[in-house]
Amino acid sequence: MALNIENIIAEIKEASILELNDLVKAIEEEFGVTAAAPVAAAADGAADAGAAKDSFDVELTSAGDKKVGVIKVVREITGEGLKEAKAIVDGAPSVIKEGVSAAEAEEIKAKLEEAGASVTLK
């Protein structure tokens, strides 16, 4: 079977975000790799250690007992539809928002925890 790169790219273009997320996870597991971007080493580690983190990823670690409420909050935060929000909650642990400010991350965390979810900021 010949590998047709153009067909693969066309399929990827038509896939939803959730399908692409599942694809990335499957590739990571199959080949033992990660999709994380490499971290550049700082020239001066001491100067970097003192700098405050300015962007955070909000990760849903568990939906808890009130799954329906958590799905509603995830829909509100992400702007996704019901099906997509449910898939995000069912797929926990999963990142809800990436690269948000500390204030926004804390606000999202508070909303999710109020709905009954467990959340971590990375």
Swiss-Prot record:
Keyword terms: Ribonucleoprotein, Ribosomal protein
Pfam (any one): Ribosomal_L12_N
InterPro entries: Ribosomal_bL12, Ribosomal_bL12_C, Ribosomal_bL12_C/ClpS-like, Ribosomal_bL12_oligo, Ribosomal_bL12_oligo_N_sf
GO cellular component: cytosolic large ribosomal subunit
Regions that span the bilayer: none
Self-association state and partner proteins as the record states: Homodimer. Part of the ribosomal stalk of the 50S ribosomal subunit. Forms a multimeric L10(L12)X complex, where L10 forms an elongated spine to which 2 to 4 L12 dimers bind in a sequential fashion. Binds GTP-bound translation factors.
Function: Forms part of the ribosomal stalk which helps the ribosome interact with GTP-bound translation factors. Is thus essential for accurate translation.
HAMAP family listed in its UniProt record: Ribosomal_bL12
Family: Belongs to the bacterial ribosomal protein bL12 family.
Name by which UniProt lists this protein: Large ribosomal subunit protein bL12
Gene source species: Streptococcus thermophilus (strain ATCC BAA-491 / LMD-9)
UniProt lineage: Bacteria, Bacillati, Bacillota, Bacilli, Lactobacillales
